[in-house]
Design a protein with these regions (language model features):
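Glycine-rich loop(s) and the adjacent beta-strand/alpha-helix scaffold that form part
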Residues: 152-198
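A conserved short coil-to-beta-strand element within the FAD-binding core of flavoproteins
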Residues: 125-138
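Short hydrophobic core segments
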Residues: 4-6, 29, 129, 148-164, ...
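Beta1/beta-strand and adjacent pyrophosphate-binding region of the FAD-binding site
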Residues: 1-11
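An anion/pyrophosphate-binding glycine-rich loop and adjacent beta-alpha core
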Residues: 33-35, 40-41, 49-56, 89, ...
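A glycine-rich dinucleotide-binding beta-alpha-beta segment and adjacent secondary-structure elements
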Residues: 125, 298-378
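Glycine-rich FAD pyrophosphate-binding loop
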Residues: 4, 20-44
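Glycine-rich active-site loop/strand segments that organize a redox cofactor
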Residues: 46-92
Length: 403
């Protein structure tokens, strides 16, 4: 069959390679000047291609269980075997995140390009699809310059995340033109903008912390890990984990940060009491030196309502309790999440109920398939979205007809 894959990202490359290996004539269309451009930016340029801790709880959407058949078709182990078979060496970190041993995202893109070429895929970069029509013979793919016929079409256009790297609404619009519907779309795995009264002075400071995103003190989401403070709010892996909830939850939200999760409030009080007893000549500016980053320690003191020039000997047990409490609950009112340009993934997408999970073929338009971020599935930070791309691209590329 003559197969056209629209979108040369992770899922599109996998779908094209799989379909070509199945004996089909495959053309891969990519709007950008080269395939895999967004892949080059993943994992801070290292490409976190999957995670050893894989499972349904790491995925979201109106029906997250939709992923199961794809993950049965191409499991975590099978994914690693696939990449190892292409000659890519990988390494796993303690948190389960898997990276190319080279620490270069370009290595992943290269082996996929080589595999596509070896399988006989015709890749056309710089080809912007403007329309998709169903015909009696199959499909017609439209651009400003030409039309291409296809027996089968796999839409792998990605989502709106990373607009500067090519994220657009094009995939949604193509599928909507054929009768499909899209959920509300939100940026996810993105920085959170907060009240910056205290964070502005912390730009660039990192901390390992426990985070709770709360509405009226009730947690709607929680995470643990690295937080990076910015001039507008917070970033980092632990923040990305909360960003989906921050984008979708209604009502005023507050981010509560425990800056010393390994210590209880009484333990922090005792630590400060010992410092006060042994070094009464210190000023409050240095009370938390060696406990927190210097700028963070000073900010916690200001947050708790204390100046930086008072002698620590003037602090009462109640003062120490208040300062310890501030370190355990550094609360920042949430303003918003940053937009799609800074997001790593789109939450929401084409409704999965309109596709057969066992084949990823459209229930509305026979011969039409979709995979990856364009569908209403998104994963947590840590390689989960790329695993969905690999598995869904593989299943779609099998071009199963279903029952």
């Amino acid at each position: 069959m003559n197969v056209i894959v629209i979108g040369g990202g992770a899922s599109g490359l996998m779908a094209a390679i799989t379909a070509a290996k199945g004996g089909h004539s495959v053309t891969l269309l990519e709007r950008q000047a080269r395939v895999g451009r967004k892949l080059l930016s993943t994992g801070n340029g290292r490409c976190n291609l999957t995670n050893l801790n894989m499972g349904l709880p790491y995925y979201h959407g109106q029906d997250a269980s939709f992923i199961r058949p794809a993950f049965e078709a191409l499991s975590l182990d099978a994914t690693l075997d696939f990449f190892h078979g292409l000659g890519l060496l990988t390494t796993a970190e303690d948190n389960g995140r898997v990276y190319p041993y080279s620490d270069q995202a370009g290595s992943v893109v290269d082996v996929l390009r080589f595999a596509a070429d070896a399988a006989g895929v015709t890749t056309r970069a710089g080809f912007e699809v403007t329309g998709l029509k169903k015909t009696k013979q199959g499909f017609t793919v439209l651009s400003a310059e030409e039309t291409l016929p296809a027996d089968r079409v796999i839409v792998c256009c990605g989502g709106m995340a990373g607009g500067k790297l090519g994220g657009t609404r094009s995939g949604y619009e193509l599928l909507q033109s054929l009768g499909h519907s899209v959920t509300k779309l939100y940026p996810a795995l993105v920085q959170i903008k907060t009240d910056n009264t205290f964070v502005k002075a912390l730009k660039g400071v990192r901390a390992n912390a426990d985070l709770r995103l709360c509405r009226n003190r009730d947690a709607v989401a929680a995470s643990r890990g690295e937080v990076q403070f910015t001039d507008f709010g917070v970033s980092g892996p632990a923040v990305f984990e909360l960003s989906r909830a921050a984008a979708t939850e209604k009502g005023p939200l507050t981010l509560h940060i425990d800056l010393l999760p390994q210590l209880s409030t009484p333990e922090i009080e005792e630590l400060l009491r010992r410092r006060l007893s042994s070094m009464p000549e210190l000023t409050t500016e240095n009370l938390l030196a060696g406990v927190l980053h210097n700028r963070l320690g000073r900010t916690v003191l200001r947050y708790a309502g204390y100046g930086l020039t008072d002698p620590v000997a003037s602090l009462s047990p109640a003062d120490l309790r208040k300062i310890a409490g501030a370190a355990k609950d550094f609360a920042l009112p949430v303003v918003s999440v940053l937009g799609f340009d800074g997001a790593q993934v789109t939450a929401g997408g084409i409704r999965t109920a309109e596709f057969d999970p066992k084949t990823l073929q459209s229930r509305l338009v026979p011969g039409l398939y979709a995979a990856g971020e364009v569908l209403d599935i998104d994963g947590d930070c840590g390689g989960y979205n790329l695993q969905w791309a690999w598995s869904s691209g593989y299943l779609a590329g099998l071009l199963k007809s279903g029952t």
